[in-house]
A protein has these predicted regions:
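Short, charged beta->alpha transition segments
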Residues: 72-74, 103-114, 221-223
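Canonical Radical SAM [4Fe-4S] cluster-binding loop centered on the CxxxCxxC motif
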Residues: 74-103
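Short Fe-S-cluster ligation motifs
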Residues: 108-124, 298
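Hydrophobic, secondary-structure "cap" segments at the distal end of domains
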Residues: 304, 309-334
């Protein structure tokens, strides 16, 4: 798991603000990322460091014992070289910008943990200079947390599409869970609203993580002390309502992700209008939260009841009944 830390050139903006000013900006900027619920890792602390993934339950809702589990949820930076039309942090937006240093990420995580505010870290990021540069900084932060600070709590990190495979591998040996945001359900929607991003660059690290997890499971059967690779699995997130896809299309995409990439979770984020753009929908009623809720209910049927998307919806009936949950709707039709 060890690797050589590489020198990083800190962006000048990082030296212009206090740590608390950065925290205020970068915690607020992270609120639109919903994929921070987490589970499935059973690694215990060994008594020589701090943190314990098993004891915490590791989720941002409720643990098996009913306790609410807290993760420090922040962006490494809200600087971004991309100009995604739906994102508050798009390059062309005039918003306060900030970036942490790796040491500041460590300081915040350890101080928040020692004060019993959190039991883990959820770290996402905009793209500072390049995908590789950003991933190098994230790797350095997580490496220092694990080694210098002996932090053994839960860490969920967003992988940066387009970053070098060796950086994805490096981060996978440090994090409990990784995720790569699908962003939008279809490649066409991505091309229209996020012209700097490409579907292939998203699916490539997703496939690498899947293959790494499978290989690691085989290694652990032979040598139980082999370093773990993303032991809590991977997840993804897609925005719902920013593009015209039907619920049937969205559930079909989710079903394929579960089957082909063995994801632990697909998260659905109701589109929140934060920018004015001719290509973005106008939602007089606000974010489609009830639609998001129905998708989560249907997702549960896919993951735990073995349903297929075509059993719940079809081309003739492409959207869920907002007045009836998908399971009840299916029962009434059968």
């Amino acid at each position: 798991m060890a690797f050589e830390l590489q020198d990083t050139k800190v962006s000048p903006i990082e030296n212009k603000m206090s740590l608390m000013e950065k925290l205020e900006i970068l915690s607020d900027a992270a609120k639109y990322d919903v994929s921070c619920s987490s589970s499935g890792v059973g690694r215990k602390g060994d008594g020589t460091g701090i943190g314990n993934t098993l004891k915490a339950g590791i989720c941002h809702s409720f643990g098996a014992d009913g306790r609410c589990i807290s993760l420090l949820k922040i962006l490494f930076t809200n600087e971004c070289i991309y100009d995604c039309k739906y994102c508050i942090n798009r390059r062309s937006n005039d918003v306060p910008r900030a970036s942490f240093t790796p040491d500041e990420i460590c300081e915040l995580t350890i101080q928040f943990y020692r004060r019993n505010y959190i039991e883990g870290l959820f770290l996402s990021s905009g793209i500072l200079q390049s995908p590789d540069y950003t991933m190098e900084l994230i790797c350095e932060a997580v490496y220092k947390l694990r080694t210098l600070h002996r932090f053994q709590g839960y860490i969920h990190v967003k992988a940066i599409p387009g970053a070098a495979p060796e950086l994805v591998q490096r981060l996978g040996l440090l994090a409990d869970r990784m995720s790569v945001n699908l962003e939008l359900p279809t490649a066409e929607g991505l091309k229209n609203l996020a012209p700097n991003k490409h579907r292939k660059n998203i699916l490539t690290p997703m496939r690498q993580i899947q293959q790494g997890i499978t290989q690691n499971k085989n290694e652990l059967t032979v040598y139980r002390h082999a370093p773990s690779f993303v032991p809590a699995g991977q997840s993804t997130q897609m925005i719902v309502g920013a593009t015209p896809e039907s619920d049937y299309q969205i559930m079909t995409v989710a079903e394929n992700l579960y089957r082909k990439f063995e994801l632990k979770r697909v998260y659905y984020s109701a589109f929140v209008s934060v920018n004015e753009d001719k290509d973005l929908p106008v939602l007089p009623g606000g974010p489609p939260l009830l639609r998001e809720h129905r998708l989560y209910q249907a997702d549960w049927l896919l993951r735990f009841y073995g349903f297929e998307a075509q059993e719940l919806l079809s081309r003739e009936k492409p959207n869920f009944n907002v007045l009836l949950d998908p399971k009840a709707d299916w029962a009434l039709r059968h």
